[in-house]
Amino acid sequence: MARCDVLVSADWAESNLHAPKVVFVEVDEDTSAYDRDHIAGAIKLDWRTDLQDPVKRDFVDAQQFSKLLSERGIANEDTVILYGGNNNWFAAYAYWYFKLYGHEKVKLLDGGRKKWELDGRPLSSDPVSRPVTSYTASPPDNTIRAFRDEVLAAINVKNLIDVRSPDEFSGKILAPAHLPQEQSQRPGHIPGAINVPWSRAANEDGTFKSDEELAKLYADAGLDNSKETIAYCRIGERSSHTWFVLRELLGHQNVKNYDGSWTEYGSLVGAPIELGS
């Protein structure tokens, strides 16, 4: 898949802010970032309240996703440009959702909010609303989603990529250092997993590294291209960034995101765990 099929540059974005059938959507770890300022005309998706089921641990189903996008003014035929802070961390998570529910025209703004701000491009604090649509999501494409039992069966059979920090991988901490150290019952990693922190795929300005650099990054870590791959992190958001790199940029077709990730796996009774690097 060519990069232009899944990425747009900041120059392209600034030239197409008001293009018909193009919708800019901001998704951030810091859900208040959009409220301070955002790309003019962009709408907000809150990863906690919009994309997660309010009761059970799962993301919104197809009906809920359809309702959400209809209310936000996104149509099935629109080209959705996702962006956010911190190397498009949660924007990539939302990209995976859109692909899961069959949206055909969805891309990431390469560099996200970080590069946009580094370039000195304009931001707006004006409220944004769009006319309501009648969006219809497709049934979920579970060929890009891994579940617990598949992960257990994949140990020493498929590629397992742990995209968390080395300290999380080794079991020193349970979550990113800036977050509460809670949720999973045990630290460590899935046996046989290789550790390639997700952020190593990005340049200093938040853009993705070249295909050649990315291929070398995973090859040097021991990724076997002949095997299927499952990526995981803590709750599935950082691993969606790695899923994007492997599948959408490098063209690996058999790649899944395990969104249950360590908060599920690290609390399973009897599941094998390794400590150390």
UniProtKB/Swiss-Prot annotation:
GO cellular component, one term: plasma membrane
Keyword check for Repeat: yes
Reactions mediated catalytically: thiosulfate + hydrogen cyanide = thiocyanate + sulfite + 2 H(+)
UniProt entry tagged with the keyword Metal-binding: no
GO MF annotations in UniProt: thiosulfate-cyanide sulfurtransferase activity
SMART domains, sorted: RHOD
Domain of life: Bacteria
Pfam families noted in UniProt: Rhodanese (PF00581)
Enzyme Commission identifier(s): 2.8.1.1
Keywords for the protein's UniProt record, in alphabetical order: Repeat, Transferase
Active site: C233
UniProt xrefs under PROSITE patterns: RHODANESE_2, RHODANESE_3
Function as written in the Swiss-Prot or TrEMBL entry: May be a sulfotransferase involved in the formation of thiosulfate.
PANTHER family: THIOSULFATE SULFURTRANSFERASE
Name of this protein: Putative thiosulfate sulfurtransferase
Organism in which the protein naturally occurs: Mycobacterium tuberculosis (strain ATCC 25618 / H37Rv)
Phylogenetic placement of the source organism: Bacteria, Bacillati, Actinomycetota, Actinomycetes, Mycobacteriales
Gene responsible for this protein: cysA1
